A protein has these predicted regions:
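N-terminal ligand-binding/catalytic initiation module
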Residues: 45-321, 585, 611-622
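Glycine-rich phosphate/diphosphate-binding loop of Rossmann-like nucleotide-binding domains
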Residues: 323-441
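Long hydrophobic segments that form regular secondary structure
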Residues: 426-491, 534
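Adenosine-phosphate binding glycine-rich loop
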Residues: 81-82, 322-328, 341-344, 467, ...
């Protein structure tokens, strides 16, 4: 034991000298990476050395010590270290905090009670969002503990649906910068900007250009709250330490005239950059991110349809990256369908699926369904033929000349629609398709409120004993139908999941729980699984594995009337199971170190951070 400890100390010391430069890692233990070596030898080393020697360090039961050079008000301004009134008397003396805080030393429970009391005083969801954002900027540990305690109440505030309103008002409620902003005029400074990030050991990056924010369209720089919110969910749901996350806004302009004419707009006041110039900008960003943060998982978020699929396909083989709008939405929807199959006692290959909306979310859902059907023994051609895609111009079929590649693969042959009775010649509406196809599954991603009309739903229910209906559009006002209507129009036979949160439905004396088809059940676990396994790439099969892991957690499988998706209170357990499935898939594909499931699970558990206060110690910069 003594020899091993001496060897580790020697390794660290030699690493310092070999690197030729020294930096201070001020937050080593609160990142959940504590070890005896880290506490005894202050890690003043560059990231590559840190990664190299940390793997040799023994994991201790107590990860509760953080060392920092910060003191006084500078320490209180650091949200990752600040404990506010919870700093102990000894810490206040050591860290230069005497007199800077009220004399009472509070417990976290007291802080939580006070904070929640103030939160409840807010009279609008936007005020609640601002309150929580301010708490995050002041004390991240308390912020995440509060979210854990009230996840069902607060997750719709920190992310969908309320984050949409926050994005729309971003330049008017802006208080403090978080993450990195890279505007097109700064394209020659991308590497410099990336190296200005507050932390070097970044594990997850979420990046957007703000062009397609939820169902709200082009919100320019205001889209920055999407990466911020997504990364908050990575921490809340999967325990990814906030110091290892980085939100990034790629500001390539905006075509939103309201923003361009707003005197308070904080973004680059210019029409959006397109074509080769845009592609070169993205290429420079990806290259810079890969150099600055070689171990990070890159998540593309809320890019417009024309770019989302193209960028995913362009970079998925080069960097560990995925698009949650495409792959995450597809996986979480597939999980709900798999759970519904258990409820109705059927299989995917027996379904007739109609999907309204043909954007990146819809095609991502179709892609995951096809992959699962192929896994059940269908050919890819037959699987695609079971899906009837309807966009703003009607049914996607061979007779149309306006189809891009992502839609074209789902185009139905003309002979399958010949002879249909349709209301408008040459146009196959959603109602026409439902009447002719007799779908068993109806999915909506078109952000058209009321699109699933009573006529359409009753027609579907007339032909299908247990219609499966997923109105998935966000925010709530964009939902294709209200669950209460769907339950009533089908006499209580519909199996419903929604994209936005809805209350339980009481019909004919029975209570129907409405599960939220929420990506937060998928993407945090995917990121955690990739990080813990060290997978070199993120693949579609990992998302199918994630979907199957999530479907296994469905309450509806064992109890009629229960939701298709687990309660949000169980999301950390779900994320761990999803992560294990993803890590195992990475091993099976030869993309990660060949570890057995128990070893992968141990890595996953070690990676997950819990929001609890560390004991803060002052150290002197060498």
């Amino acid at each position: 034991v003594i020899f091993g400890a001496l060897a580790r100390y020697a390794f660290v010391i030699l690493s310092w000298y070999s690197k030729g430069s020294i930096i201070t890692v001020v937050l080593q233990v609160t990142c959940g990476l504590g070890s005896e070596v880290e506490r005894e030898v202050i890690p003043m080393i560059e990231d590559e050395t840190y990664r190299g020697w940390h793997a040799m360090a023994p994991k201790l039961e107590d990860d509760s010590i953080a060392e920092t050079t910060l003191t006084g008000e500078s320490l209180l301004e650091n949200p990752l270290l600040n404990k506010g009134s919870a700093f102990t008397e000894a810490e206040r003396r050591e860290l230069g905090l005497l007199g800077l805080l009220p004399p009472h030393v509070a417990t976290m429970e007291q802080q939580l009670a006070r904070t929640y009391e103030n939160y409840r005083r807010k009279t609008s969801d936007l005020e609640r969002y601002i309150f929580l954002a301010s708490l995050q900027d002041r004390n991240e540990t308390l912020f995440y503990r509060l979210l854990q305690e009230h996840i069902r109440e607060m997750s719709p505030i920190v992310y969908t649906p309320e984050v949409g309103e926050a994005c729309e008002n971003y330049s008017h409620i802006y208080r403090r910068a978080r993450g990195l902003y890279i505007s097109y005029p700064q394209r020659d400074d991308i590497e410099t900007i990336l190296r200005n990030a507050s932390h070097r050991h970044i594990r997850v990056i979420v990046v957007t250009d703000g062009e397609r924010i939820l169902g709200l369209g082009d919100l320019g720089l205001g889209g920055m709250d999407i990466p911020v919110g997504k990364l908050a969910l990575y921490t809340l749901c999967a325990g990814i330490h906030p110091a290892t996350t980085l939100p990034i806004m790629l500001d390539t302009g905006t075509n939103n005239p309201t923003l361009l004419n707003d005197p308070l707009y904080l973004g680059w006041r210019h029409e959006r950059v397109r074509g080769p110039a845009y592609d070169a900008f993205i290429e420079a960003f990806v290259r810079g991110a890969r150099n600055a943060f070689p171990d990070a998982v890159l998540q593309w978020e809320d890019f417009a349809k024309d770019n989302a699929r193209r960028l995913l396909d362009r970079y998925r083989e080069d960097v560990r990256s995925f698009n949650d709008d495409i792959q995450g939405t597809g996986a979480v929807t597939l999980a709900g369908l798999l759970a519904a199959m258990d409820v109705v006692g059927s299989t995917l290959r027996e379904q007739r699926i109609v999907a309204l909306g043909a954007g990146s979310a819809a095609t991502g859902i179709c892609e995951q369904i096809v992959a699962a059907m192929v896994g059940e023994g269908m050919t890819q051609r037959d699987a695609r033929a079971a899906i009837w895609l309807v966009d703003s111009h009607g049914l996607v079929h061979d007779g149309r000349s306006d189809l891009d590649a992502s839609k074209g693969i789902y185009a139905q042959p003309n002979d399958r629609v010949a002879g249909w009775e349709i209301a408008t010649p040459g146009h196959f509406s959603l109602e026409d398709v439902v009447r002719a196809v007799h779908p068993t599954v109806l999915i909506g991603t078109a952000a058209l409120p009321g699109a699933f009309s009573e006529t359409i739903v009753r027609e579907m229910a007339r032909r299908t004993q247990r219609p499966i209906i997923f109105p998935l559009s966000n925010p709530t006002v964009k939902s294709e139908a209200a669950p209460a209507d769907l339950i009533a129009w089908t006499e209580g036979r519909a199996i419903v999941a929604t994209g936005s949160p809805f209350a339980d439905v009481i019909y004919d004396g029975r209570t129907f729980q409405i599960g939220q088809c929420n990506n937060m059940f998928i993407f945090p676990g995917v990121g955690l699984g990739v990080i813990a396994s060290g997978a070199r790439l993120v693949t579609n099969s990992m998302f199918v594995s994630a979907a199957r892991a999530l479907s296994a957690c469905s309450p509806a499988r064992s109890s009629p009337g229960q939701a298709l998706y687990p309660p949000l209170e169980e999301v950390r357990t779900v994320s761990r199971r999803v992560a294990l499935a993803v890590a195992a898939a990475a091993v099976d594909e030869g993309l990660a170190e060949p570890l057995a499931p128990p070893d992968l699970d141990a890595r996953i558990r070690e990676t997950m951070w819990e929001p609890r206060y560390a004991s803060v110690r002052h150290v002197t910069r060498q």
